[in-house]
C-alpha cells in the first residue's frame, strides 16, 4: 500500500514566518530515509537543513531554489510505495488550494513565550507539550537564549511538557545580576520550577547551561530526574578563554563574526542576521556588565572554575558533544563518572543545532528510560 507524504517549510523558532530554499540535497528519484537532510533553507536568523520525518522516494520537488515560501508551504512530495504522477498532481493541487485558503493574518499563531516576576526578577520562558511524563527544562549557554533550542524544543515536546527559559542577563529576562555566579543562575532555575509548580524535572543544559543544570542537581538533588548535558561546562578543566573574552569585547560585526564562527563546525551557519541580532542584544542596557560577570565566574583564562563531575554519579546522565567543538573539548565527554555518551564527529559547540535530529532522538530515548 502506497503512502504519499508532503514535506513542508518548518518553523524554526518563535519569529520565523518564511524561509528561502537555498539548495536541494536530494534529487527527484532519490531514496530518502527518515532523518535524511533533503534541502537547505535559509531564514533571517539561521541557515539549516530540512530533515525528512518519513522515508520514501522523493517524487516531486515543488519548491524551487531561491524561492521564498511561508512556514507550512509545500516543499516536496515523498512517496512510500507506488503512486501515479496524476495522484501526485492531485495531492499538490489540493495542498496548494487548502494552504492558500487557510493562510493569512487570521491563522492561529500558536503558543507564545511568557514573562513574569520569578524569584524577584523578570523572567521569560516558553512552554510546549502536554502534561504527560516528568517535565523537561532547557537551559541555554553563555550569551544565548531560549531560541538556542529552536531545532529541539518541538521534537522533545512531542512526549512531555518542555520549558525553555532565558537565564538572567540573557534574552528578554532581566539583565541585572547580583553575584553573577553559577549559584545565582541555578537559584533562578529552581525559582522557575517553584513558580510553575514543578516538583521534579529533567534538566537539559548547553555549555554554561550544562554547568547550571549540574549545579541545580547539586543544590537540590530531589528536584532533578535526569541530566542531559550538551557540550557542557563543568566536566573538565579546559575552555577557550579567548572566545569568552572576544565575545564579551566584540562591539561590531567584524569583531563578533570571528567569535561566532567558532561555535559551529560549518561557519556558513553564521548569517548576517544572526550577527545583527547578537549585536542588538549586546547593546541592551545591562548586558555588557552581566556577560563580564558571568565570563569571570565561568573561567580563569583557559581554565574552568567549576568541576562538577561528582554530581554526574548522583543522577542518570546523557552527555552529548560535537567532535569539532572549538569552545570546550569533546574529550570532556568521557572524563566524568558513568553516563551515556554521544559524540557527533562533524558537529561543533552548537551540536544541538548542527545535528538536531541525532541529538533529539538520543534525548528522547534517554528521557523515556528515566
UniProtKB/Swiss-Prot annotation:
Listed GO biological process terms: acetoin catabolic process
Entry EC no(s): 2.3.1.12
Record pathway: Ketone degradation; acetoin degradation
Disulfide bonds: none
GO molecular function terms noted in the UniProt entry: dihydrolipoyllysine-residue acetyltransferase activity
Keyword Acyltransferase included in the entry's annotation: yes
Domain Lipoyl-binding: 4-79
Protein name per UniProt: Dihydrolipoyllysine-residue acetyltransferase component of acetoin cleaving system
Species of provenance: Pseudomonas putida
Chain's gene name: acoC
